């Protein structure tokens, strides 16, 4: 795949932004509820894509949810509970910068959940997502990946750029060494039953 020129990129971006604004207006007018999950490897471009999507949109209609590490209280709750209050209302788009799939990604690979908790997630997630779909939520899921070499290059660039260092946490640096362990995660994300139905 070849890169497009900057001029062509800007031209295409303008066209797509107009379409996004039209889509937003249609969602608002029809009272639709749209939840978009952005998952993937660190430095794969999730944040950049979310930024490009939200820039032309009305923040009263489209919002981003990027939850921090769960509190002790949240850890004691039903796993999906912390996400439920952020789900979209009629006429709203919610973009999740990471989601409940943290359980099968970061939490599993980094040892933040037990094997039993992970297995329960794999059983419960399709049921939870079916509940969302039956309630009228349009659920869209994206998985972003990047090669081991490209991830290393992007991490290095972030370390060198003071304006981007906030994007790297000690956990990101630790997880960098587990690139191979994250590989099966994308398969899990893409093959849970609701993914074929969404």
Question: What would you call each of these model-derived segments?
Answer:
Residues 60-70:
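Short beta-strand-centered segment that lines the nucleotide-binding/catalytic pocket of NTP-utilizing
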Residues 108-122, 132-183:
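A glycine- and Lys/Arg-enriched "phosphate-lid" helix/loop adjacent to the NTP-binding pocket
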Residues 38-53:
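Glycine-rich phosphate-binding P-loop
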Residues 188-194:
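Conserved small/polar residues in nucleotide/adenosyl-binding loops
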Residues 1-12:
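Charged, amphipathic alpha-helical linker segments immediately N-terminal to NTP-binding catalytic cores
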Residues 21-27:
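Pre-Walker A adenine-sensing motif
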Residues 70-73, 99-102, 145-152:
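Conserved nucleotide-binding/hydrolysis micro-motifs of P-loop NTPases
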Residues 74-117:
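Conserved nucleotide-sensing/catalytic segment adjacent to the nucleotide-binding pocket
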């Amino acid at each position: 795949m070849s890169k497009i020129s900057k001029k062509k990129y800007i031209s295409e971006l303008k066209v797509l932004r107009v379409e996004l604004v039209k889509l937003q207006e249609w969602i608002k007018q029809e009272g639709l509820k749209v939840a978009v999950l952005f998952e993937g490897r660190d430095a794969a471009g999730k944040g950049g894509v979310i930024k490009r999507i939200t820039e032309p949109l009305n923040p009263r209609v489209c919002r981003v949810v990027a939850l921090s590490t769960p509190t002790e209280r949240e850890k004691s709750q039903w796993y999906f509970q912390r996400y439920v209050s952020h789900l979209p209302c009629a006429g709203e788009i919610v973009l999740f910068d990471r989601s409940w799939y943290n359980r099968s990604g970061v939490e599993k690979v980094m040892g933040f959940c037990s094997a039993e908790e992970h297995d329960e997630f794999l059983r419960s997630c399709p049921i939870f997502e079916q509940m969302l779909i039956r309630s009228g939520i349009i659920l869209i899921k994206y998985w972003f990946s990047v090669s081991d070499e490209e991830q290393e290059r992007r991490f290095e660039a972030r370390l060198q750029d003071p304006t981007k260092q906030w994007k790297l946490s000690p956990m990101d640096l630790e997880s960098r060494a587990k690139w191979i362990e994250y590989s099966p995660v994308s398969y899990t994300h893409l093959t849970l039953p609701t993914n074929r139905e969404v």
